[in-house]
UniProtKB/Swiss-Prot annotation:
Family: Belongs to the IspG family.
UniProt lineage: Bacteria, Bacillati, Bacillota, Bacilli, Bacillales
Protein name per Swiss-Prot or TrEMBL: 4-hydroxy-3-methylbut-2-en-1-yl diphosphate synthase (flavodoxin)
Record's keyword annotation contains Iron-sulfur: yes
Catalytic activity: (2E)-4-hydroxy-3-methylbut-2-enyl diphosphate + oxidized [flavodoxin] + H2O + 2 H(+) = 2-C-methyl-D-erythritol 2,4-cyclic diphosphate + reduced [flavodoxin]
Transmembrane segments: none
């Protein structure tokens, strides 16, 4: 078997102002739930996604009304826009003309070679990449006939066939996904793909389910794949508000130390020793840091047994006991505060840390 190609060794592909592949960086994506032709609703949903950390957004493009709306949508958002195209090559051409940053197609279902060539040439002329989206539930008939059912080998074979179509047309700005609702199948498919080609991989567990069950299923599957050192972008697919997809994706990346722009909460599971309202405090702090785009580790702990030690491991933290708490910053006690103002005092310190991070980041960027 070939050696696994890790994420930092994949081929860099430019998607709008983002570079996908060629580094340790992972990018979070989502997809709108609105009718794309409804520009106002689609833009409003994308703005909500931007606020919680979505970095690339995909919209369905099933007809001309949707294709005709892409330009107006693109002008009003701040992250790269991807058009999802199936079957009709003319919609892909319209999307490219509208200025989208990437198109998602399967070259095999666009039609004859001359149609694929038109799409590829148009994308090449505008430096727009193409994502090949292989899905276990819609593999080509010949693949199913060969293997009997969806397999990781069949999914990779399908991806390679589609890749060859593009490479034969001298097109290499390619990103590939191999999604399945079966977690084990998805893990195996992505592992095999990472050994078969060096194009960036977009990760996902498709049709994973509702917010609760789907979030757990996605975290299990994506976590296993990420732990292999592969994957360059990801989407958590949920039957829920897409904002929830971003929240789960951010937590998955934070768990693996792969998010450079998100705050992380550490809080204890509670027990009979707790003497403060820790669950309420932890939830309030979690909501507060949800939109902070700085790599700050925040601890909320509820007793004197593990609290002080755990809090010292965080950038900022509080260890509560007997209706009051000790505020820690980088391992040192700042002050003691009563429970009534504990959260507000912690928020102030979080804001100070975030501001320091942004100032340092600005200074470093000015030196480049």
């Amino acid at each position: 078997m070939n050696e696994r190609i890790f994420r930092e060794n994949t081929r860099p592909v430019q998607v709008g102002n983002l570079t996908i592949g060629g580094s340790e960086e992972l990018t979070i994506q989502s997809m709108t739930t609105t009718k794309t032709h409804d520009v106002e609703a689609t833009v409003a949903e994308i703005h909500r996604l931007e606020e919680v950390g979505c970095q690339i957004v995909r919209v369905a493009c099933p007809d001309e009304r949707a294709a005709n709306a892409l330009s107006a949508i693109k002008k009003r958002i701040h992250i790269p826009l991807v058009a999802d195209i199936h079957f009709d090559y003319r919609l892909a051409l319209k999307a490219i003309d509208a200025g989208v940053d990437k198109i998602r197609i399967n070259p095999g279902n666009i039609g004859r070679r001359d149609r694929v060539e038109k799409v590829v040439n148009a994308a090449k002329a505008k430096n727009i990449p193409i994502r090949i989206g292989v899905n276990a539930g819609s593999l080509e008939k010949k693949i199913i006939q060969k293997y009997g059912y969806p397999t990781a080998e069949g999914m990779v074979e399908s991806a390679l066939a589609h890749i060859k179509i593009l490479e034969d047309l001298d097109f290499y700005d390619i990103i590939v996904s191999l999604k399945a609702s079966d977690v084990n199948l998805a893990i195996e498919a992505y592992d095999k793909a990472s050994r078969a080609f060096n194009y960036p991989l977009h990760l996902g567990i498709t049709e994973s389910g509702t917010q609760f069950a789907g979030g757990i299923k996605s975290a299990a599957g994506l976590g296993a794949i990420l732990s292999l050192g592969i994957g360059n972008t990801l989407r958590v697919s949920l039957s829920a508000d897409p904002v929830e997809e971003i929240k789960v994706a951010r937590e998955v990346l934070k768990s693996f130390g792969l998010s450079s722009n998100a705050a992380m909460l550490i809080s204890c599971p509670t027990c009979g020793r707790i003497e403060i309202d820790l669950i309420r405090i932890a939830n309030e702090v979690e909501n507060y840091i949800a939109t902070i785009k700085a790599p700050i580790k925040v601890a909320v702990l509820g007793c004197a047994v593990n609290g002080p030690g755990e809090a010292r491991e965080a950038d900022i933290g509080i260890a509560g006991s007997n209706g009051e708490g000790l505020l820690f910053r980088h391992g040192k006690i700042i002050r003691k505060v009563p429970e009534a103002i504990m959260v507000e005092e912690l928020k102030k310190e979080i804001d100070i840390l975030a501001e320091e991070y942004f100032e340092k980041k600005t200074d470093l960027e000015s030196l480049r």
